[in-house]
Amino acid sequence: MRAMRFLPVFVALLLLTSCLAVMSCGDEAGGGGPAIGDIGAFQSALEADGFTVQEGKLETFDVIAMYNAGLIPSCYGNNAQAPYMCYKLPVAPGQTTNNTVSDSPIKPENAGLWADYRLRPDEAIVFIGMTPPECSYFSYCNYIAVRYYPDEGQARRVFGSLGDPLNNMTIGTEGTPNGEEGDVFGQNTVIICTADKGIDGRVRDSLASAGYSMDIVNTDVIPPGLVKMGLDAEDDTFILLHRLAFFTDEQAGEDYMASEQGTVFRLTPGGDTQLEPFEVPELRVRGTGDTAELDLLGALQELHQAILDKYGNLRATELKTSIWLLQGYDAIQTGTDALGDNNDTVYLRSDNFTLSDNPQEFLIVYGVNHTAIGKYSYNNFSIYGADIMNGIAGRENVTLAGSAEEYLPDNPAAQYLYACKVARDSGGDPNIVEIPTGPGAYGIPLDVQAFLGYRIYLEKETKTGPFWFELLYDRVIKFSPQ
């Protein structure tokens, strides 16, 4: 009798505990309950709506290894310090034309999957998974990869972005519903890539029916007016890049990069689709008009002179800095190679140079440590071979901090500047960036021309790349024996 008397109380307490646990989980995910649904139910809903569902992958794209294996023609100006991931997809139902890039020769488990892919105008790609662990920057961005030019009778790489990326300041996740401020790292998200409004709506309906909150669903538009969609050899190919930079916990970052992320579906509708093409999306506007960084020009000139004074016994060659890449829409119109550009940064570069293994021949890279100003997410430089565009080494804002104070010990502006030595042999000095000669694309041979590329990422106020002319350009001096 006593046990029966306490049973309702026990059940009530159990129910209350369960409710509190659910509420707590919902609060941690951004308030309003779990936003993630059931993938199996989502797939069933898609198939009930007539879609053919094929599974792909989101995993690492090792540019240097791909080049060394002869699978790609260059390294595309890769950011030496920031890894890449990409979708790897099967061909569409009925597609008979191969795509152009697959890593299956070095990863046999990826046989039948392609890093670039052709798409029908009514198809979609869906990613369901977690954002990366805490880092300085991440994004997801669609590109036109290869375009056929009938006047030339050949296909050429364009590698131009198709709009603004979904980045860590704009993406909708459980921690940042609808892109609001919050905890964006290690959060559930959904990304739909498609060119068609109707298909986007049908995919969202299937997601909703499977329990997914629209607060975490993002549509990354492929603008059909700028591309040629279809499955034939003369149609464009596409690629999605997932960029990541400078993990707070390096081991967590390595674990993320080493594993296949989330679930990727290629969705192909059955029957005839009445197309409802998206317009070209608006771009976020670069620049705020804040030119405070330009006030550091005097201090930068003092740093320049201090560097020359320190190495006054050597010959100094000033290497000019210029704008390296513009944006994907420029490349699409002009038929030039944008090298996988990203609207969230600016790209600057130095003149070409060669660097011998003479200990008296080296570079001093210097400039404003742009992130120290407080406007940007990160900045870095990379060293490239000019022939194959292989980024092999570099430095970023955290390790550059304080490096100018050696030259300007009494100037308070030195905290906003940097100076870094680059040489063939560092002699074990961690403050010197070493340029190896190989093996393969992991180095730059002594007789091959090289250059420096500079990036400044993601202005916090605009959530896009900086405006070039609000910056003081990074600089480099080559020193060599007299």
Where do the protein language model's features map onto the residues?
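A compositional/structural signature for long, glycine/proline-rich flexible linkers
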Residues: G33-Q482
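Bacterial Sec-dependent N-terminal signal peptides
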Residues: S18-I39
